Amino acid sequence: MTTSSYFLLVALGLLLYVRQSFSTHEHTCQLDDPAHPQGKCGSDLVNYHEEKCEEEEARRGGTNDGGKKRRRASPLRKRRRFISMLKARAKRRGYQGIACECCQHYCTDQEFINYCPPVTESSSSSSSAV
């Protein structure tokens, strides 16, 4: 085996390893896949995801500050954005994401929290400065 083909083989193996290491989705779904009996779909998925994200945000820094709540996006706007994201993903042939992970399959609460936007330090520090 020549040095260049050996190098190519090692590079491809490393690339495959990195791809699998950074993949956060466990499943790939098709549009005709049935929903899991315990999966959350549609508005149930949106409501449960929003609830878990708010609980996680409160656990990490609290959301009792009225000023902070006013600066957050309205729940209706967040819901519309989330639903449009789900529709865009559903148009693909094979898709991954929260709809695949938590509707066609079952998600734990921790898996739902993994789909929440990160709590930024600026929002935590601004609430302490008010």
Swiss-Prot record:
This is Con-Ins G2b. Expressed by the venom gland. The keyword Magnesium does not apply. It is found in: Secreted. Venom insulins constitute about 1/25 of the total venom of C.geographus. It comes from Conus geographus. Belongs to the insulin family. The modification 4-hydroxyproline is found at P34.
